[in-house]
Amino acid sequence: MPLISIDSRKHLFYEEYGQGIPIIFIHPPGMGRKVFYYQRLLSKHFRVIFPDLSGHGDSDHIDQPASISYYANEIAQFMDALHIDKAVLFGYSAGGLIAQHIGFTRPDKVSHLILSGAYPAVHNVIGQKLHKLGMYLLEKNPGLLMKILAGSHTKDRQLRSILTDHMKKADQAHWHQYYLDSLGYNCIEQLPRLEMPMLFMYGGLRDWTFTNAGYYRRSCRHAEFFRLEYQGHQLPTKQWKTCNELVTGFVLTHHS
């Protein structure tokens, strides 16, 4: 799989499959591109692209602190390097913050915005505790954190091993910074600027992000929402068939 140069000092590793409308997948802290294991099947319909953000997986580490704005600029540069003028962005969990940031800072880059487990700010207690617990375990017992994350995403032993092995490659300082900046990030005031077609996917009561849907319903009235009752936060892996069907239908319906 290829490495691509973003600037003279940094290379990003990515996987790419299929042809047609490009969809770029943006992962949450630590997990890297492997969390989108099942979204590779979307290559039947689209050109699907899975980068490891810098400091994650097989991409280069960086000398400066990671942040939502930094990674948003990195994805825009990544698109330029691949000669992609505009793409569908799929952001999962905190990866959705990066996708949203690109959406209102570089709307010319985004044809559609698809967000699974999205939030514009971490305002509820559960979300705050999860972010702080992630940072604490990363400092005290990173192996346990990786085990928890892998286990919460799948019951499949092989995929759990794939996810864990990939998380071990992440630079823990940048993983921590990604958590920290996600915890402090707030783009609620910018949401009305997101005018591209948008799809939001949430789980049920076990998905801590679902309460954030109200922010988007008020500010992005053109957006579409889909809730999977009785499901948790980890839709790309645990409900991948429905997730992929929603992506396919949404993009093809709104493609001009």
Swiss-Prot record:
It is an enzyme of class 3 (hydrolase). The keyword Protein transport does not apply. Residues 22-122 form the AB hydrolase-1 domain. GO terms for molecular function: hydrolase activity. GO terms for cellular component: membrane. It comes from the Bacteria. The keyword Hydrolase applies. Keywords: Hydrolase. Its EC number is 3.-.-.-. Pfam families: Abhydrolase_1. InterPro entries: AB_hydrolase_1 (IPR000073), AB_hydrolase_fold (IPR029058), AB_hydrolase_sf (IPR050266). Induction: Repressed by RghR. Belongs to the AB hydrolase superfamily. This is AB hydrolase superfamily protein YvaM. It comes from Bacillus subtilis (strain 168).
